[in-house]
Amino acid sequence: MSLSLPPALSELARALPYSRTQWLPILVGFLIGYPLLIKALRYKRLGEMKKKFYFPTRESMAEMTDEEAFLIQKEMAQLEFPFMFLTSGQFALFRTYGIPTISHLLTKTGQFSKPETSFKRYTDTAALIGEMVENSPTSQRAFISVARTRFLHSGYQASGKILDADLLYTLALFAVQPVRFIENFEWRTLSDLELCAIGTFWKSLGDALGISSEILPSGKTGFKDGIQWLEEVDVWSQDYEAKYMVPDPKNRESADQATAVLLYNLPKILHPIGLQFTSYMMDDRLRKAMLYEAPSPGWSAVFSSLLATRKFVLRYLSPPRPAALAVSNIAQKPDKDDRYHRMSWDALPFYIRPTFWNRWGPMAWISWLMAHPVPGDHGQKYYPQGYHIQDIGPKYFEGKGHKEIQEMMKELKISRTGKCPFH
């Protein structure tokens, strides 16, 4: 007895070879067209930015204002390259620990003496920088964060424990590290408009923080634009490292505490891989100064492949991030007590509001599985009530410096008006 297919299936079987032939051009067109479409959409935002902030020539960029630079950089940090902006900021701070004068001061203050203090210092630094870079240069929040940072540094500067050159070096890293990371690891390189914005913003912020750029080649005669300042501070920082980034046990001590923060939410079984990646992201000079071993050739190949794959996927397969999903790590508005909160946590949940999502969402489940605290645990230990900007810093500085901050803010409202810092 022979078996036969139902008429409908027989018809489908006869049509199938022809369907494959018909679908082949569509499939090929999709495989070619989709990556080209994604690439075009990704570059569309850069084109729109160039139209919105119209500086057609290098000469015209000399007129870029602090406010314009802030808006351009904010778009880069929140929409174009959020992951690398965050990562480069973390490694900028990490890199400063390769300078013995900096690492010795940190260990003497006791801020790296135990996990709670080192984790809070990391979060406090991130909060202050976030307030400075995510808010308009002429906003109250930016003024307070700049003034608070100046107050926290003032005592150490007066005693000679913080060197002016170390402050300029730290400022330089926060300006040049995003450029280096984006050039090496992102889906496109930066335009002159974006480079000028980074240089203009950080030069202006340095002025507000009282960090002089006079030591740079054009420091006394004047910089023509943000690109020139960025180029000169980049070269100067590399020369500074060549002289002062040398091996020291305190460098290693500071680096180990910082690495503990970066790897905190990684299962301990994966910590060796995390340490390999941390070493991979260092250059030879930094690695030697921190007394770290070079990553193995095998892991270096794996990390290089993963980063290259990420670059390809972002450039050709992943649509651009919509404005509704802009990445911001600080609350846009204060709560009823005029306090602000962090929106995410990397290690211990300092300044995180204990909402239902934060206590029961994916990040909370990861924390629970690793026996780590979640927002709201341990009473007020992790400041679930948030922060007043004027109180950010070590516990012994809480409630102090308010009068000095008010005086500094009066000065800032006169000196930092959002205009071009070069003219």
Curated annotation (Swiss-Prot):
Keywords for this protein: Endoplasmic reticulum, Membrane, Oxidoreductase, Transmembrane, Transmembrane helix
Residues passing through the membrane, by range: 23-41
Bilayer topology: Single-pass membrane protein
Principal place of residence: endoplasmic reticulum
Domain of life, per lineage: Eukaryota
Side Lumenal, residues: 1-22
Catalytic activity: 4-farnesyl-3,5-dihydroxy-6-methylphthalide + AH2 + 2 O2 = (4E,8E)-10-(4,6-dihydroxy-7-methyl-3-oxo-1,3-dihydro-2-benzofuran-5-yl)-4,8-dimethyldeca-4,8-dienoate + acetone + A + H2O + H(+)
Enzyme kind, highest EC tier: oxidoreductase
Record carries keyword Cytoplasm: no
Coiled-coil regions listed in the entry: none
Protein family: Belongs to the mpaB oxygenase family.
Function per UniProt: ER-bound oxygenase; part of the gene cluster that mediates the biosynthesis of mycophenolic acid (MPA), the first isolated antibiotic natural product in the world obtained from a culture of Penicillium brevicompactum in 1893. MpaB' catalyzes the oxidative cleavage the C19-C20 double bond in farnesyl-DHMP (FDHMP) to yield FDHMP-3C via a mycophenolic aldehyde intermediate. The first step of the pathway is the synthesis of 5-methylorsellinic acid (5MOA) by the cytosolic polyketide synthase mpaC.
Official protein name in the record: ER-bound oxygenase mpaB'
Gene: mpaB'
